[in-house]
């Protein structure tokens, strides 16, 4: 059972960055895309990630490539409004930062100023280190994302775990180190062989947040729709389902439809009637 966090100030980038030592409590992260969901998750987590995964789980897109800055801003605003405790981080979508550090800064600054979120997340290894440093030097906190990078799914040959051989393992460790040295305050390590993710965690001085990686990471994140059993198109190997809300929602809709068709709903207690006087 989750431990409800005490009410008080919202967690900061510095709070998350400090959770690195083996004695530190692991960082608890979940994705959120709406104010009601953020409100439910906020007391239990340290970080709410407004992930570009919303393109697939909310909008039904086949990949995250169709997600826009405007979509991320709208959902980022909702999550910030719905939370008061967790640090809120917003993904930078595909095409919004890869062209140049200047492009990345323009879009990151817009995301932060229009949402009220504390940080942005971007994918990439050594090729993005210059961009990460450029943003951090200009006051934009950055969470990195290495290993399996969904925005590069086509270039990477699909959704396949990284670190299968020595060359891939070294590449994952090197990109984790490069992003940490560039100034990221934490790094998501996704879809990476356990031993490789554990090694990458040991070799950097900032917290790693695992998703399909290792229990040795400094924190964990899951897509909330996966964890709640709401997204049923497919279930990644690394997902643990904590509920089966798809079945619950379907059963509720079925019961509602039956009541309407049988004229059991609305019942008198659900209707506004005229009071009798005298």
From Swiss-Prot:
PANTHER family: 3-METHYL-2-OXOBUTANOATE HYDROXYMETHYLTRANSFERASE (PTHR20881:SF0). Pathway: Cofactor biosynthesis; (R)-pantothenate biosynthesis; (R)-pantoate from 3-methyl-2-oxobutanoate: step 1/2. Binds 1 Mg(2+) ion per subunit. Keywords: Cytoplasm, Magnesium, Metal-binding, Pantothenate biosynthesis, Transferase. Belongs to the PanB family. Mg(2+) binds at residues 52, 91, 123. It is found in: Cytoplasm. It comes from Rhodospirillum rubrum (strain ATCC 11170 / ATH 1.1.1 / DSM 467 / LMG 4362 / NCIMB 8255 / S1). Catalyzes the reversible reaction in which hydroxymethyl group from 5,10-methylenetetrahydrofolate is transferred onto alpha-ketoisovalerate to form ketopantoate. InterPro entries: Pantoate_hydroxy_MeTrfase, Pyrv/PenolPyrv_kinase-like_dom, Pyrv_kinase-like_dom_sf. It is an enzyme of class 2 (transferase). One of its GO terms (cellular component) is cytoplasm. Its main location: cytoplasm. Its EC number is 2.1.2.11. The active site is at 190 (proton acceptor). 3-methyl-2-oxobutanoate binds at residues 52-53, 91, 121. HAMAP family: PanB. GO terms for biological process: pantothenate biosynthetic process. The gene is panB. The lineage of its organism: Bacteria, Pseudomonadati, Pseudomonadota, Alphaproteobacteria, Rhodospirillales. Pfam families: Pantoate_transf. This is 3-methyl-2-oxobutanoate hydroxymethyltransferase. One of its GO terms (molecular function) is magnesium ion binding. It catalyses: 3-methyl-2-oxobutanoate + (6R)-5,10-methylene-5,6,7,8-tetrahydrofolate + H2O = 2-dehydropantoate + (6S)-5,6,7,8-tetrahydrofolate.
């Amino acid at each position: 059972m989750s431990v409800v966090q005490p009410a008080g100030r919202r967690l900061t980038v510095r709070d998350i960055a400090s959770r690195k030592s083996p004695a530190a409590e692991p960082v608890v992260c979940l994705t959120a895309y709406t104010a009601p969901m953020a409100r439910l998750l906020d007391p239990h987590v340290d970080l709410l990630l407004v992930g570009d995964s919303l393109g697939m789980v909310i909008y039904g897109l086949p990949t995250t490539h169709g997600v826009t800055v405007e979509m991320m801003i709208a959902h980022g605003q909702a999550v910030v409004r719905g939370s008061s405790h967790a640090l809120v981080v917003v993904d930078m979508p595909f095409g919004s930062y890869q062209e140049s550090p200047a492009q990345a800064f323009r879009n990151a600054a817009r995301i932060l100023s229009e949402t009220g979120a504390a940080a942005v997340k971007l994918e990439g290894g050594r090729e993005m280190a210059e961009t990460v440093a450029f943003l951090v030097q200009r006051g934009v906190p950055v969470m990195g994302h290495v290993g399996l990078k969904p925005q590069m799914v086509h270039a990477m040959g699909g959704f396949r775990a990284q670190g299968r051989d020595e060359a891939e393992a070294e590449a994952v460790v090197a990109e984790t180190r490069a992003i940490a040295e560039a100034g990221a305050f934490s790094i998501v390590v996704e879809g990476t062989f356990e031993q490789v993710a554990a090694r990458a965690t040991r070799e950097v001085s900032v917290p790693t947040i695992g998703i399909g990686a290792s229990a040795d990471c400094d924190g964990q994140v899951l897509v909330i729709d996966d964890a709640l059993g709401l997204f049923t198109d497919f279930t990644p190997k690394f997902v643990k389902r904590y509920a089966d809300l798809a079945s619950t929602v379907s059963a509720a809709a079925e019961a509602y439809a039956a009541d309407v068709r049988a004229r059991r709903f609305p019942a008198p207690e659900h209707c506004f009637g005229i009071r009798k006087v005298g």
